[in-house]
């Protein structure tokens, strides 16, 4: 029986990222985890709200993400909840990220943590910070689209 790797089940989303940043490009990265971390994620416990991605010479790390200790694991088998976790990306993706991050105003933010089949993946975005007027414009455009949908719904 083939594994179903197309289905994705979301664990945690970083909703502020799309509000505070303009996402230029998205990447899907694997993440190096311990067993108790995976068990905790299967229970739906994780937070990437305060997390960010550091791009080093030859690898990328997720820093600041919190995966709470797994309650059923003993004290010796558990993990540190907010340790840095290595991201699994192709060498050319890491090179691309490293080059782009050196540009002014460009950063890498985690967008979503999810299960794809039995694997844990992290969707990261190459992002540029929004100014206050950009946030207002985005909000106005979203409101306009909502109003148009409402008007079209009443008409037909």
Question: Where are the predicted features?
Answer:
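Short, surface-exposed linear motifs at loops/turns and structural transition points
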Residues: 2-5, 11-12, 60, 155-156
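A short, contiguous, amphipathic alpha-helix enriched in charged residues
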Residues: 4-20, 84-102
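A positional/architectural concept
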Residues: 10-55, 59
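Flexible glycine-/small-residue-rich
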Residues: 35, 55-57, 64, 124-128
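Helix-adjacent hinge/juxtasegments
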Residues: 54-97
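Switch/connector loops and helix/strand junctions flanking conserved nucleotide-binding motifs
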Residues: 70-72, 121, 132-134
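C-terminal end-helix/capping segment
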Residues: 82, 89-95, 128-156
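Beta-rich strand-turn-strand
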Residues: 88-125, 129-131
């Amino acid at each position: 029986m083939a594994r179903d790797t197309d289905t994705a089940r979301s664990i945690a989303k970083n909703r502020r990222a799309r509000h505070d940043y303009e996402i230029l490009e998205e990447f899907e990265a694997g993440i190096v985890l311990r067993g108790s971390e995976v068990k905790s994620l299967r229970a739906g416990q994780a937070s990437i709200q305060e997390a960010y991605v550091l791009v080093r010479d030859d690898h990328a790390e997720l820093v600041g993400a919190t995966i709470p200790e797994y309650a059923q694991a003993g004290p010796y088998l558990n993990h540190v909840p907010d340790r840095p976790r290595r991201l699994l990306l192709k060498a050319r993706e890491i090179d691309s990220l490293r080059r782009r991050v050196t540009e002014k105003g460009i950063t890498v933010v985690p967008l979503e943590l999810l299960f794809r089949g039995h694997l844990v993946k992290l969707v990261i975005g190459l992002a540029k910070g929004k100014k206050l007027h950009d946030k207002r414009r985005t909000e106005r455009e979203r409101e306009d689209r909502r109003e148009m949908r409402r008007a079209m719904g009443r008409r037909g």
